[in-house]
Amino acid sequence: AVKCIGWQETCNGKLPCCDGCVMCECNIMGQNCRCNHPKATSECES
């Protein structure tokens, strides 16, 4: 799983995206995070 550094965007206002997702995308500075593939038990949505 990819881990972001710095600030992480929340998913649905709940958990940090990269903490609850199998994969995420970051910008070049690692200051933004977006779910690509949520875990089955995660409340993140891609």
Swiss-Prot record:
GO MF terms, alphabetically ordered: ion channel inhibitor activity; signaling receptor binding; toxin activity
Protein's UniProt keywords contain Disulfide bond: yes
GO cellular component entries: extracellular region
Subcellular location: Secreted
Tissue-specificity statement: Expressed by the venom gland.
Alphabetically ordered keywords of this record: Disulfide bond, Knottin, Neurotoxin, Secreted, Toxin
InterPro entries: Agouti_dom_sf, Spidertoxin
Disulfide-bond pairs as recorded: C4-C18, C11-C24, C17-C35, C21-C44, C26-C33
Function: Potent toxin that may paralyze and/or kill insect pests such as H.virescens (lepidoptera), S.exigua (beet armyworm) and M.sexta (tobacco hornworm).
Domains (record comment): The presence of a 'disulfide through disulfide knot' structurally defines this protein as a knottin.
Recorded family membership: Belongs to the neurotoxin 02 (plectoxin) family. 02 (plectoxin) subfamily.
Name by which UniProt lists this protein: U1-plectoxin-Pt1f
Lineage start: Eukaryota, Metazoa, Ecdysozoa, Arthropoda, Chelicerata
